Amino acid sequence: LSVVFDYDGNLWFATGGFRIYPQRQQQGVIGYIARSAIDAILNGEQTDLSKAVFVYELTPGEGAENGIAASKDGAVILTNQNCYLLRAEEGVDVVWRTPYESAGAKVSGEGDKTTGGGLAWGGGCSPTLTPNLVLFTDNQDPVNLLALDMKTGEVVASTPVLDDLPEGYQVAVENSAIVYDDGNGTVSTIVCNWFGAGNAGLADPN
C-alpha cells in the first residue's frame, strides 16, 4: 500500500488497503526493513531478513488505508482507527497512538456530510507534517481536520472541513491536506473535497 524511508534510512511499509467488512479479520501489517539490510542488499551481500524486518500487527478490524509520512521523530501512519508515531528501535516502538472517530464506509444520504461514496473506512487523508504537528481528516459527520502534537499525539486543534454545506452536498477526503507553516506560529491548510469522484462499493453487503 505504501513505503517510505525514515530519516535514518529504514524503509517503512504498510500493507492492506481497502476492503469490505474490515471487522472480520486483521488485514495487513505495518513495519520497517532495517537500513543495515538494505545497505547489504545494495552492496550485493547476503543478509538475514528474518533479523531485519520488523512488524507491528494490527488488531482485527484495523487497517492502513493511506500513505506514510516520515519526520525526524519517526514514521507517522494513519489506520482506520488510530494515528501512530512509530520509531525503529530494534523493533517497532510505538511512541504514541491517538484514536479518532469514523462513521465507516457508509452510503451517504441527502444532506449527509460523511465520506460515503469514498474509499476509506477511516480518514482518507494521508498524514501531513509540520515540524510540530500531524494533520489529517477523520470520517465523522461533519468531516473534521485534526491537528496532533508531533511529540505527544495530543489533539491540539479540530475544525470541520466545511461547516456550512449547501443542501445535498457532502464531504469526502481522499488526499493529503496541503499545509503551509510560516514558522511564526501560523499554519494554513487546504483540504480537497473528493466527493463524487468514485465509489468502491465498500458499503455494499453484496
PLM feature spans:
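Extracytoplasmic/lumenal domain signature
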Residues: 1-14, 18-206
